[in-house]
Curated annotation (Swiss-Prot):
It comes from Sulfurisphaera tokodaii (strain DSM 16993 / JCM 10545 / NBRC 100140 / 7). It catalyses: 7-phospho-2-dehydro-3-deoxy-D-arabino-heptonate = 3-dehydroquinate + phosphate. CDD domains: DHQS. Belongs to the sugar phosphate cyclases superfamily. Dehydroquinate synthase family. GO terms for molecular function: 3-dehydroquinate synthase activity; metal ion binding; nucleotide binding. Pathway: Metabolic intermediate biosynthesis; chorismate biosynthesis; chorismate from D-erythrose 4-phosphate and phosphoenolpyruvate: step 2/7. It is found in: Cytoplasm. Catalyzes the conversion of 3-deoxy-D-arabino-heptulosonate 7-phosphate (DAHP) to dehydroquinate (DHQ). This is 3-dehydroquinate synthase. The gene is aroB. Its main location: cytoplasm. Its cofactor is NAD(+); Co(2+); Zn(2+). GO terms for cellular component: cytoplasm. Zn(2+) binds at E173, H237, H253. Keywords: Amino-acid biosynthesis, Aromatic amino acid biosynthesis, Cobalt, Cytoplasm, Lyase, Metal-binding, NAD, Nucleotide-binding, Zinc.
Length: 352
């Protein structure tokens, strides 16, 4: 088991990684807890570690992120007499951590939050970083806060029954860290595909640990995205989000990001920021893990107009330019402000 202890803005944050990591909940035995969980998940494994708690299932899908639904969750905390010394647990995937994190951040200006992701994607990305968000007027994540959990528990037991396809979707984000932040992680991935696909305990623990440390190092340096550092976490996401939007969100996030990383690496090489061979390194590692490289391989209809429109509305747009992290070599990156018309041209080539 690995434990990462970090300090962010005078707040202590612990990340517990490994089989049996849920044992970290024992310290809540004497605490009052609200357990929010996805309806798709059996919460009994978590409940066995708690004593005084209420359980609140979260509806599936984007409806859970509606602001009115979030306020209903706030009301449940209020009606059950929760105060700032009590705890909220978010058990599930990105939707659950998004909405429950938002609720925790606004209730009494902040109540203790523990994230327990149940997918590889959640363990290496969604549960880390403190971003929360709910939808408003049919716009995704237009309301949100930066609010750090006191603890993140990544228990590998949740991954035992996860289909390999779900593991692959999470691996896209792991590969991202290796490509732009961590050559050691890239090398580890290059040598350990069989172990990772076999869900070897030590291999999964290693990639989750390295990914968690990589992401948290970026978050510590630029928690609120004001210094242009946290932008590195968006490698592959500008084109990737456009693909998601153009498919009416039928393409899974991990697959969209995989194609997005290929497109953005090609762009970086073509405009002269990436060393020769970077695109080959990107495509090789993604293909090793059986991730899609092109839009055609997604087996989904992409509305190019809708995808391009999503790029123009990207939150990274500033004064006609899009802030993008380009890989310069494996494990390194550079921020480049790309004219939006240039980006749209590259994107159209990639999406057709």
């Amino acid at each position: 088991m690995r434990i990462v202890n970090e300090n962010l803005c005078n707040n202590e944050i612990s990340i517990v990684i490994g089989k049996g990591a849920l044992s970290a909940l024992e310290e809540l035995k004497d605490k009052k807890v609200a357990l929010f969980y996805s309806q798709k998940i059996d919460p009994s494994r978590v409940k066995s570690h708690l004593k005084s708690f209420i359980e609140i299932p979260i509806i599936d899908g984007e409806g859970a992120k509606d602001i009115q639904y979030a306020l209903k969750l706030v009301k449940l905390l209020f009606e059950n007499g929760f105060d700032r010394g009590d705890y909220v647990i978010a058990l599930g995937g990105g939707t659950v951590t998004d909405v429950v994190g938002f609720v925790a951040s606004i209730y009494m200006r902040g109540i203790n939050l523990i994230n327990i992701p149940t997918t590889l994607l959640g363990m290496v990305d969604a549960a880390i970083g403190g971003k929360t968000g709910v939808n408003f007027e049919n716009v995704k994540n237009v309301l949100g806060t930066f609010y750090q959990p006191t603890m993140i528990i990544s228990d590998l037991n949740f991954l035992e029954t996860l289909p390999l396809e779900e593991i692959k979707k999470g691996l896209a984000e792991v590969i991202k860290y290796g490509l732009v932040l961590d050559k050691d992680l890239y090398d580890y991935l290059a040598m350990n595909k069989e172990k990772i696909f076999a869900k070897d305990e030590s291999a999964l623990e290693e990639i989750i640990y390295k990914s968690s440390v990589d992401k948290f190092s970026v978050v510590k340096a630029d928690e609120r995205e004001t210094k242009g550092i946290r932008i590195v976490l968006n490698f592959g996401h500008t084109i990737g989000h456009a693909i998601e939007a153009g498919s009416n969100f039928t393409v899974p996030h991990g697959y969209a990001i995989s194609v997005g990383m290929v497109c953005e690496a090609k762009m970086a090489e073509e405009v002269g920021y990436a060393e020769e061979g970077v695109v080959e390194d990107v495509t090789w590692i993604l293909s090793q893990y059986e991730l899609p490289l092109t839009v055609d391989s997604l087996n989904a209809k992409i509305d190019v107009k809708k995808a391009i429109d999503a790029i123009t509305k990207d939150k990274k747009v500033r004064g006609g330019y899009v802030m993008m992290p380009f890989p310069t070599r494996i494990g390194d990156w550079k921020r480049v402000d790309v004219p939006i018309e240039t980006l749209k041209g590259f994107a159209e080539q990639c999406l057709r």
